Structures are given as C-alpha cells and as structure tokens.
C-alpha cells in the first residue's frame, strides 16, 4: 500500500545550492579511490551514516571506497555488512588513528597517534580523496596523516580542508543530512538521497513477506539502548490497543534486551505480531537487514530514539519518534512523512508527558 503521508521537499534550498555552487566555480574532482574516516560505528551510528554512503556512491560510482574506523570496530564489517554490499569495498577497523581526541584513551594510544606523523597510517597507503566525518580539531590533525591528494573535513569551519563548501554554506542540524553535505561538497553538486529499497539479499525480504503478508501493520519499537530515552511501556501498549481497535495490526520490534517483555505483551495484546521471535526466528536471517526488510512492509511506526528506529527509517517507513531529554533535530528520520514529538512542546523534558492519545491521532494520519 502506498504511503499516504507525503513530504514537501524544500526546492528553494536546492535551487539556492546550485546557484551558489556556480557562483563559486568549485572544481570537481574525480577520485579513483576514496577513504572515509570515522572513529567507530555502532549499529545506530552506522545507520545514521547510511544515506551518506549511498550518496557518496551515487556521485562517485566508479570510485573504490575504503571505510576506516580509526579507534574501534565498525558494524559495517559485521551486522551492517549486508546493507553496504556494492557500496563500501573495504572496511578497516582499529586503524590506530584518532585516539588523541578521546578523553579515556591511554598513554600508549596517544603516543601511537603522534607516531602517525612519522610513519603514515594504513601502511602508507594513499587515497585520492580522504573524508573526515568527525569535527574534533586534534583528531583531524591526526587523520590528515593518512596520505591523500584531497582532504575534506568540516572541522573548524573547513579550516583544514582543501575542498571548501560554497559561500553562505549552512550546516544542517540533522546528522544524516550533515554527512550528505560532505558528499555534496566533494562532488560539487546537490544530492537527492537515493530512496529505499536498499540492496538486500532476497532471503530477508522473503521471510519478511511470510511474517507480514498483509498491509495494515503499525510498527512499535518500545526499547532503546539508553533506558532514559524510553517512553513508558504502558504508553506503547495503550497505542497498540488503539491500533487493534481500529482494525490494524501492531508489529512489535523487540531486541534481545526486550525479550523479557515478549510474553507480557502477548498477554496484553494477543493479536500482536513479533516477527523477530518464535516461528519466524532464523539463525541466518536476523539483525538490522531483517528489520529493514520488515519495515518495508509496515504502514508507519512509533518508537523511542533508538537503533531500531534508525533501522525502520532505513526501510523507508515513516516513523513517529518520541523525545524527552534528547533533542530531536539531530536524529529525525529522513523518510518522507516521519515526525518527531518533543516533550518540550508540552513544557517539560519528561518524555512520559507525551500522551498516547496525541500519538494515536498522528498515526491515524498515515491511513487517510
């Protein structure tokens, strides 16, 4: 079923971007290989970066892309690897680059960072274009020791970058959009982020179709890695009951930490579907790729600010996210029709002051 809620694109911004780019006559580059530096990638971090990766491949389709996690591991080499097949050619983890900007880095790690000025990291490999995604000054100085022809970094208003944005450039608040801006600056052109579906192995979508064969589903993701970001479970259950009353089917996304809620929710909302558990659970079909495939089959969703929310957004499902203490602007979903509800609009940072009835009215809008 086609999504009923449409997104109004800001075409004036696009036109303005093109005019400014022409005025500044930015030289376009054609890198045969690109390195992207990050400190690390947890699941949520990685999903926020996914629009940037797709945009980078869109504007540089023939370039080999190497993803460098300077200080820790990257989920793009693990649970998120199915999402970047054909987009990222190589992932280098724990490259020992960038510890100097981490407050809890030990003495040896900091010394190794300084050694990078003498012995360039990544075995001295050189890249045509090196993109630094973080903005800590000392870390950027270390990242620049990776050999390169062109360097792009937003640190200190692009002070260290030899590729500059157009004049009057305004950095986006949203983290995903901010990263996409780096790809725009590198290519010298405005980018329309490729919409879903993502390139997934067929096995994920086949199982998702078995689990969710109908078309009137509403996703519910009640968990979060940071429990202080969680709307109370009772609120989610009240929303689920309203969904059932309106002849729709609630689909609960429960991670390992929420498994203990499974039986309780089943008892409260018997009609609920739990596609990641029970008869649908497969050892080789799970994780973010499966959640994204499921999200392609639901009409809309409600969630906390969480990694699961980013997965649902990556599946192209409009999502309603509730926020309390954390600010919504940075983490608002990019899917057309997505909405953030900020408890500050109700005069408080207490997320539970957002009432289920208010959420129900918003969810109803996706079925009109």
Q: Which residues are covered by each model-predicted region?
A:
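Catalytic machinery of carbohydrate-active enzymes
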Residues: 2-368
